[in-house]
Amino acid sequence: MVPVGSPYFADYMLRLLIEMGRAEEAQSIIQERWGEFSRQGGTSVWEVWDMEQSLSHAWSCAPVPLAAHYFLGVHQRDSDLGENYWILPIAGSLRTVRGRVMTKYGAVHVEWKT
């Protein structure tokens, strides 16, 4: 696989991997790449993989919406104007997941174990 050039591009690649049934590979990349931020002393996500640019950059937050949509599995039903949601998580290598997603109707709490 071609190395991920930046955290920005990683969002597209991670989504594609998960949609192709390769969630464990996507989770491994998340643990390796985003874990490196904290191993290098970071307290936020950086614009690039090293500390040469902005040390707090929104485009580097790719794992956050991925976690809500794929790993928690919270999906809004397209036909219901956001009032109804369904839960269909993709576990990959995860064994326990707990979290919540905020909606205009309140929080959707999810917890599951394999």
Language-model regions, residue ranges each:
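Alpha-helical support elements that line or immediately flank enzyme active sites
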Residues: P7-G21
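Non-catalytic C-terminal accessory modules of carbohydrate-active enzymes
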Residues: E19, E24-T114
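Solvent-exposed loop and edge beta-strand segments that line ligand/cofactor-binding
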Residues: M1-A10, E52-W59
